[in-house]
Design a protein with these regions (language model features):
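Short, low-complexity, Pro/Ser/Thr/Gly-rich segments in the mature regions of secreted, periplasmic
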Residues: 122-135
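Extracellular/periplasmic head regions of type IV pilus-like filament subunits
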Residues: 61-120
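Membrane-proximal N-terminal amphipathic helix
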Residues: 38-66
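Hydrophobic, well-ordered secondary-structure segments
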Residues: 11-14, 64
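Alpha-helical hydrophobic helix detector
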Residues: 16-32
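N-terminal leader/signal peptides at the extreme start of proteins
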Residues: 1-10
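Conserved Walker
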Residues: 11, 28, 43
Length: 135
């Protein structure tokens, strides 16, 4: 008696179904990863802003010990232990713009940060899409 030999492998229909399922999974997963990259940039910018505010606070505290209670007139690399101003992850800039008023939360600039020397306020400039006013 002759035995029929079983064919192994996938049919074209099975392969197409797998590709369709993978496509559907990719379509639903990609937007979630895009949102994560935006959140990561925001978190990195907030971390840099924390470093900027700490540097200003330390400089102010040092001026108090000498009896000249004043905020630094500008933010320079000398205020940081590694002699580098942190990069604003939203617009990839390390420069600091002096200003007399708080910019809007979505204000953009070539500078990464804004600084008001009269009050010691420091903030992050946006990339135009992220509102930084609540930071």
């Amino acid at each position: 008696m002759l035995m029929k030999r079983k064919k192994s492998g996938f049919t074209l229909i099975e392969l197409v179904m797998v590709i369709v399922i993978l496509g559907i999974l990719a379509i639903t997963a990609i937007p979630k990863f895009v949102d994560l990259s935006v959140e990561a940039k925001k978190a990195a910018a907030q971390g840099g802003l924390g470093a900027m505010r700490s540097a200003v606070a330390i400089s102010y505290a040092q001026s108090v010990t000498t009896g000249t209670t004043q905020f630094p007139s500008s933010i320079t690399t000398s205020l940081f232990a590694d002699s580098q101003i942190p990069k604003n992850a939203l617009n990839n800039s390390t420069s600091v713009a002096s200003t007399s008023s708080i910019p809007s939360g979505t204000a953009t600039s070539t500078a990464g940060w804004w600084y008001i020397s009269a009050s010691g306020r420091v903030g992050a400039y946006s990339d135009g899409t992220v509102d930084t006013s609540s930071w």
